[in-house]
């Protein structure tokens, strides 16, 4: 009894478990707010209507919609971990190539030239060194009694004339067997010469870049002015933005995240050392370190409260002359009536206050990010050495490349009177009117060069000489790109860095480009009905695209109930973005100016279409086309189960990321089997199968099957009979059958005790 009771208990428990644990099936959801990092090519929008802008970017729609997301997301600002920042470096370089496009090879000019230094009418009175008690010229801060106000006249008094030489050379021109003499004016910084050996000061010179394999000169001088643009995500993609107050270029968990279609307008000014005209500036100083710890690549965003600006000028006029060497080779030279004055840049605003705040922010850095001195008086700003672009403040002003030596201004910020090697000058007299390197000034001398080192590729480019007339540009200084260096003297050097990529990290570092993956999997208790199904066609509503991702921070259950609307948002956004891009490509084709960026825009459109078609193809392969919630016949065999009321789709996707391959494979196999079953069902219901019963070959097959069945039955009967016989033989002889009846003798005497003949019996005979 106890044994049977235990069996019933076990069966009861099993039935209870079976009732409480229902079978779950894989369900496909389309329209879930899930994404992954992407490196797809973004496209640009711009409000500028110049030719370059209209042939490379689509017109700005002025849509700055931003939808907050209740999630946490990692962000990284530098190019090696942020594809959007890496794209900016490549794209802005293309902008340079198209607007200041070198196209004429200058290798024939790598020959010996006879050069004579240009002499002008300007005087060359040596400048006197600044001594204690002498007022420093040209400083805006009127609160300091030792400083005076500034104007252009005061600055230009300390600017020397441009050092240049008139060079002549002979080479074959139109007539190849005869040489012709040509004359070209070079800046002294662009040639190297032997010592003068003649009485008239003629020197043998060569181009300083003669050893370079490819040197080209710009075809035309293109006027360069400010171009602002914004990056936009292609259809099917989005931009996430980190809005955390303490974001410093790297944060594993940014909690204040929003989704946008495009970035804010960014500037395309390329500089070394200082950030000009940046789009991101606040009333505070921020220090960004690469990957959160590096001191080799540091971005300092300056406080906009100090109104930091820089005004650069190139005074005077200039005449540009074309020198035709041969057919198809025209070199633009310049002719001086007198030697021109140097260009210069004047730094305005409260730079001392801004630099003091930078020093204070540096010492506040955590110990794992900064191990230098905590004494702000021992933190100094200095410049680098090496290439001219690294050793100087390098930037482009109205199409001309300025190289400005920062020593005077750095001395002013550091309150020192030293040279670039931190040595005090015994005699601070310079050449000509310019003072020596150990003075403090709020302005610096600049040179304009035609041969520059390319900032994106390892090459050099030669551009046309500076344009005629007066050059001037004013820029807002929004940051600095630096390196933090420590030494044994308990001193921290903040060294201006030529890393151009840091500029784009400052502009785009708060954004990340993501690909929307709207297909999700989760277990439900609903199994697909495998009968005939009608395909439902749905027409999307024209709704906001960013609203689709707005549900990223909500629970899975709440998001799943709105999948129809979310998928419509997604499709409507894709269609609208495609329409905008198609209009841009059409405009570019009309102008016959499908530039490199135009091709990128076209590629972005094709990528979006491919992505949408790929998603639909996957859904169709599982039998889920045009469905927002698609139940399947595939059982859910894994232990993972979602918390529909507490878990977001992003969190759930991270749990099952490794299972997606198995899930999709099983869905494809189930769909294939379902198609086979449906095909067999359709064949049974087909009228053409009725006539197949009159096929003679089919009847032969039926007879064959029947004959084999009869043979099988007979064989089984024989085996059974044989088995029965063998079983009886093994049991031995059987006893007499109890059915045989023995009749007794009626008059048998009692012969007990008398011996009888054994076993003899007989019938009695009657006697009369």
Swiss-Prot record:
GO CC, one annotated term: membrane
Extracellular topological domain residue ranges: 17-701
Region (Fusion peptide) location: 539-559
Site (Cleavage): 538-539
Keywords annotated in UniProt: Apoptosis, Cleavage on pair of basic residues, Coiled coil, Disulfide bond, Fusion of virus membrane with host membrane, Glycoprotein, Host cell membrane, Host endosome, Host membrane, Host-virus interaction, Membrane, Signal, Transmembrane, Transmembrane helix, Viral attachment to host cell, Viral envelope protein, Viral penetration into host cytoplasm, Virion, Virus entry into host cell
GO biological-process terms attached to the record: membrane fusion involved in viral entry into host cell; symbiont entry into host cell; virion attachment to host cell
Residue ranges the record marks as coiled coil: 650-687
Signal peptide start-end: 1-16
GO molecular function, one term: structural molecule activity
Position of sequence motif YXXL motif: 733-736
UniProt superkingdom: Viruses
Cysteine pairs bridged by disulfides in the record: 44-57, 103-219, 110-210, 115-167, 232-262, 242-254, 312-345, 397-473, 404-446
Other comments on record: The 155 isolate is from a monkey imported from Kenya.
Function: The surface protein gp120 (SU) attaches the virus to the host lymphoid cell by binding to the primary receptor CD4. This interaction induces a structural rearrangement creating a high affinity binding site for a chemokine coreceptor like CCR5. This peculiar 2 stage receptor-interaction strategy allows gp120 to maintain the highly conserved coreceptor-binding site in a cryptic conformation, protected from neutralizing antibodies. These changes are transmitted to the transmembrane protein gp41 and are thought to activate its fusogenic potential by unmasking its fusion peptide.
Name of the protein this chain belongs to: Envelope glycoprotein gp160
Name of encoding gene: env
